[in-house]
Amino acid sequence: GLPENLPIIAAGGDKQCETLGSGCFKHGQAVISYGTLATIAVTSKKYVQNKNFTYYTWPSSIRGAWNPEFNIYRGYWLVTWFCRQYAKEKDFPDLINEMNEKAKDIPPGSNGLFVYPFWTPHPALYPLAKGAILGCTDYHNKEHLYKAILEGIAYALKDGLHLIEKDTNQKIKELYVVGGGSKSDVAMQLTADIFNMPAKRLQTHEVCAIGAAINAGMAINMFLNEEEAVKNMTKVSKVFYPIKGNVQVYDDIFNN
């Protein structure tokens, strides 16, 4: 059904297209994808390899580059798991909206509730890990658990970022956040606080298609380079800045 002579372009993997579509192609930039599989990735002009496969290095959608990527297999799948405990399928959006509103009033650290997010073990980093919810008291309710899940995922990705920073010899200073989870103000703010850097939300949270479109545009000479394409197709809609008091709390939790 495709028209004759229509160019067919191989764009790259989904997360690699997300990295390009987010505008993460310079030294010191990283992109978090809060999807079913949660990832943090950078673009590197130099090939790096983790011998234990703690993270994977994929061919980038950007010419002459690579994408080191650390992932949590059960990322925002845990939000779906949470919803299944408290709502029917049709009520998921209503429950998430309610949780995002109530979680705004919960302090960093979720009043001592901690979620270890490895419902599926990480084969290299934590091969024997199992998910855990720690610190429960009669004070906690579902919004505490919701926020603790988001915090636990961000802690785990920060763990992976440290490994990538060391191997690629770069310090990340600029963070883009994409995927369905980026629609949550609570998720965006705690990400800025846990990583202690501005977290940028893009106008379009599903940037995989944008990255693929950029690859197609490059192939038919629509753009001079990736930078021009990103400038024309990707916009930052809001930046969340770290809150000093929250950063101190999260640093204490992460380091201990």
Sequence positions of predicted segments:
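Conserved phosphate-binding catalytic cores of ATP/NTP-utilizing and phosphoryl-transfer enzymes
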Residues: 2, 12-29
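Short loop-beta-helix segment that forms the pyridoxal 5′-phosphate
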Residues: 2-11, 201
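Glycine/Thr-rich phosphate-binding loops that ligate phosphate moieties of nucleotide
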Residues: 42-55, 59-256
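Conserved active-site beta-strand element of glycosyltransferases/polysaccharide synthases
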Residues: 32
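Generic recognition of flexible, low-complexity loop/linker segments
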Residues: 7, 19-21, 28, 101-103, ...
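Alpha-helical transmembrane segments that form the membrane-embedded catalytic/substrate-binding core
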Residues: 8-18, 207, 212
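Short beta-strand scaffold segments in enzyme catalytic cores
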Residues: 17-20, 38-42, 115
